[in-house]
Regions:
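Structural scaffold elements adjacent to functional motifs in cytosolic proteins
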Residues: 47-49
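Rhodanese-like catalytic fold shared by cysteine-dependent sulfurtransferases
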Residues: 2-6, 19-39, 45, 54-87, ...
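Short, surface-exposed ligand- or partner-binding patches at beta-edge/loop junctions that are enriched
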Residues: 91
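Bacterial N-terminal signal peptides
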Residues: 9-18
């Protein structure tokens, strides 16, 4: 009994730490292609491509602006070029960088949705891009 109580007391803080790091605490919405397309049909939604300038030039979603999340100036650029009173819909190639960007922006007071699996899922669903 005493051993079980000690085990329980020691494991509780670890479980709290693990649960606090789960995706349930995301401050943004990760959406599929259809939801993303519906969101950006609203012209007040700002569309942000967080890939490199080279990737952006290869093809991007209409109305998107490009701010590379891997640069040291991403946060400053986003705060300068984006309006916090309007939702930001963002994407990258596969979803990894956009999740990082979504976290940064949401922590800075932006309302954010991100395209799950990135522009790859967009093009795989036969959606258009522009060069």
């Amino acid at each position: 009994m005493k051993k079980s109580l000690v085990t329980l007391l020691l494991s509780t803080p670890l479980m709290c730490l693990i649960l606090s790091c789960s995706n349930d605490n995301m401050n943004y919405m990760s959406v599929d292609v259809e939801e993303f397309e519906a969101a950006i049909s609203d012209t007040t939604v700002q569309v942000l491509d967080v890939r490199t300038a080279e990737e952006y030039m290869e093809g991007h979603i209409a109305r998107s602006i490009n701010i590379d999340v891997k640069t040291d100036t991403f946060e400053v650029g986003a705060n300068t070029r984006l309006d916090k009173s309007h939702t930001v819909a963002l994407y990258c190639r596969s979803g990894r960088r956009s999740k990082k960007a979504a976290e940064i922006l949401s922590n800075n007071g932006f309302k954010v949705i991100e395209l799950n699996e990135g522009i790859t899922s967009w093009t795989n669903n036969n959606k258009t891009t522009i060069k």
